[in-house]
């Protein structure tokens, strides 16, 4: 029984330490507990009314009230739901700017990395040499290709395959492994040579008889250009027709395309 009274006495002493019997504190606590009302910032007692008392500035009253100094480390600061400090500032502007930056960045990436066409244009015959034996006509031709890169990224030409036909028969073919780099929005010229052997009696007469004034043969050239672009390999097919003088050697100068630095 004595132990029970002693425990009750100690609890009363602790309550006295935590909540001192101060009429000013009673009004303060009542005011502090009413912060959930519609006007939370004006519920605390103003600072000038507590002059000389053991109070500190209330952390949730924007400096307009005080709490007991003894409970400064025990009370938890409560911020009302409608407090301006809980409202993020410039949220709409920040979200708008973030979305705009993402859209602009995505649009620029799509614009610059979107694959565009690679133009391959046969310029024509640059030179040819002719040789004959008893039944065959040998034509060594050199032609020019214009390659235009319309992309904003560089490309690399890796292979060129050429096939030459005369009267629907394959008379020459060649395949080259290349490593030709073409910059963004740039053009390059490349030369390729093909050795052709024509085994046709009428063509042989056209090329060797002196009585015939026109010594031209028609060659059909078809080719495949392989290039890589952004780690992706693609092929382009081109074709052209060339009239070749099979009586003598010819050389046709072509104006080279100027390349940007």
UniProtKB/Swiss-Prot annotation:
Localisation: Cell membrane
Q: Which GO terms describe its cellular component?
A: plasma membrane
Q: Which GO terms describe its biological process?
A: glycoprotein biosynthetic process; innate immune response; macrophage activation; positive regulation of canonical NF-kappaB signal transduction; positive regulation of interleukin-1 beta production; positive regulation of interleukin-6 production; positive regulation of MAPK cascade; positive regulation of MHC class II biosynthetic process
UniProt keyword list:
Cell membrane, Immunity, Innate immunity, Membrane, Transmembrane, Transmembrane helix
Q: How does it sit in the membrane?
A: Single-pass membrane protein
Q: Where are the transmembrane segments?
A: 95-115
Q: Which family does it belong to?
A: Belongs to the TMEM106 family.
Protein function: Activates macrophages and polarizes them into M1-like macrophages through the activation of the MAPK and NF-kappaB signaling pathway. Upon activation, up-regulates the expression of CD80, CD86, CD69 and MHC II on macrophages, and induces the release of pro-inflammatory cytokines such as TNF, IL1B, IL6, CCL2 and nitric oxide. May play a role in inhibition of proliferation and migration.
Quote the PANTHER family the UniProt record gives. TRANSMEMBRANE PROTEIN 106A, TRANSMEMBRANE PROTEIN 106B
Protein name (database record):
Transmembrane protein 106A
Name its species: Bos taurus
């Amino acid at each position: 029984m004595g132990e029970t009274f002693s425990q009750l006495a100690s609890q009363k002493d602790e309550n006295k330490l935590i909540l001192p019997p101060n009429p000013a504190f009673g009004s303060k606590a009542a005011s502090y507990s009413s912060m959930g009302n519609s006007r939370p910032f004006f519920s605390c007692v103003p600072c000038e009314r507590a002059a000389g008392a053991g109070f500190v500035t209330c952390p949730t009253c924007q400096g307009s009230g005080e709490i007991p100094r003894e409970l400064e480390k025990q009370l938890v600061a409560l911020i009302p739901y409608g407090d301006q400090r809980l409202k993020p500032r410039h949220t709409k502007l920040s979200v708008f700017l973030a979305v705009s930056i993402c859209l602009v960045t995505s649009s620029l990436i799509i614009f610059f990395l979107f694959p565009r066409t690679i133009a391959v244009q046969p310029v024509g015959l640059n030179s040819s040499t002719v040789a004959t034996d008893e039944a065959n006509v040998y034509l060594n031709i050199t032609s020019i290709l214009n390659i235009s890169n319309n992309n904003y990224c560089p490309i690399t030409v890796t292979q060129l395959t050429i096939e030459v036909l005369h009267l629907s028969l394959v008379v020459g073919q060649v395949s080259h492994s290349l490593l030709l780099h073409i910059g963004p929005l740039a053009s390059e010229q490349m030369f390729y040579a093909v050795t052709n052997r024509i085994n046709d009696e009428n063509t042989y007469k056209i090329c060797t008889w002196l009585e015939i004034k026109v010594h031209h043969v028609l060659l059909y050239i078809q080719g495949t250009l392989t290039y890589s672009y952004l780690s992706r390999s693609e092929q382009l097919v081109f074709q052209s027709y060339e009239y070749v003088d099979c009586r003598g050697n010819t050389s046709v100068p072509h104006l080279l395309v100027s390349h940007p630095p």
